[in-house]
Design a protein with these regions (language model features):
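Surface-exposed, charge/polar-rich loops and edge strands
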Residues: 1-328
Length: 328
């Protein structure tokens, strides 16, 4: 398939610069993945679309907020992180970067995608230092500075290590999550640390030639057992966000979800066979992006682009701080 097959025209004024307030008052497009039929709701109506026994799978990764000299992407162990450094030409292996609050970082190696591996040295709590000296990394289409960094955190974020928030989860409030529990749906948490690939555009004309950047994921035995039980009983597994769907399909290629951790560069596009996920909660994605290709795989490219055309006509808000779709 060609990259241009996934192009659509989006007026810039529809790119959301701030999240809805309250979070669950964003709009929600209900999308039937078989027929392409759409309905227009609000996100707080999602609970009405859920069934008792549904399992919602959330990504609990937590953006690091570390953009001063470097952009923290993914922790790789022993106080080492994969990072992007600007300007990169000054970050040769062996370079020591000094930060405020007594934090230093030594560049140890280059990565395949233009990043670096840095080992940090510090006294005290690393997370607290980063929170104090860093700023939240935002997508390049967000031009306004956040007043409150919590705007770019899910209410359930727990595992620090992402370069960006799993943004479909931004719409959930504690109150909505409680209503979902009261409905009889279950919630399960997995972890995928969103990395460099989130910001990397597709450059190959044939999308099959695109190579995804690897990202770290983790699935607990308890999470895998809950999801496998639901699959065996014919209950729906609903991924909240494309990061959750990539985690589940990476570890579920046999139809049974495997607990554990590892790295995935899974690239989901039309023709992909889903083994775990039945439905998806997601935002509206960039033209010609891997995420638009992913949701097209859940339905068809033509039907998804038609839904996006309707979203533009109805003035839905797009991208990370924008409105949502429930693809079911």
């Amino acid at each position: 398939m060609k990259l241009t097959d996934f192009y659509y025209d989006l007026p810039k004024e529809l790119i959301a610069q701030h999240p809805a307030e309250p979070r669950d008052h964003a709009r929600l497009m209900l999308y039937d993945r078989q027929t392409g039929a759409v309905e227009h709701k609000y996100f707080y109506d999602l609970v009405d679309e859920l069934h008792e026994g549904d399992v919602l799978v959330f990504n609990d990764s937590h953006p690091t907020g570390g953009k001063v000299e470097v952009l923290l992407l993914t922790p790789v162990g022993d106080d080492r992180w994969e990072v992007l450094v600007k300007p990169g030409k000054k970050a040769l292996p062996g370079t020591v970067i000094e930060f405020p609050e007594g934090l230093t970082g030594t560049v140890e190696d280059r990565t395949d995608f233009g990043g670096r591996i840095i080992k940090f040295a510090y006294e005290g709590d690393f997370d607290a230092i980063i929170d104090k000296i860093g700023e939240m990394p935002l997508p390049p289409y967000i031009h306004e500075k956040m007043e409150d960094p919590d705007e770019y955190q899910t209410v359930y974020a727990n595992e620090r290590g992402s370069a960006a928030a799993p943004t479909a989860g931004l719409h959930f409030t504690e109150e909505l999550l409680q209503k979902i529990r009261d409905k009889g749906a279950e919630e399960v948490f997995v972890t995928l640390h969103v990395g460099l690939g989130t910001f990397r555009p597709v450059e190959e004309e044939n999308i099959e030639d695109h190579q995804m950047h690897s990202e770290f994921y983790s699935i607990t035995p308890e999470a895998a057992a809950t999801i496998n039980k639901a699959k065996a009983e014919g209950r729906r597994v609903i991924a909240v966000g494309t990061t959750s769907i990539r985690t589940l399909e990476s570890a579920g290629t046999t139809g049974t979800l495997q607990a554990g951790s590892g790295w995935t560069n899974i690239f989901i596009y039309p023709g992909f066979t889903f083994h775990i996920v039945d439905a998806l909660v997601t935002n509206f994605h960039l033209p010609e992006s891997t995420l638009l290709m992913l949701i097209s795989a859940l339905s068809t490219r033509e039907k998804i682009l038609k839904a996006y055309e309707i979203a533009v006509q109805e003035k839905y808000r797009f991208f990370s701080f924008g409105d949502a779709m429930f693809i079911h």
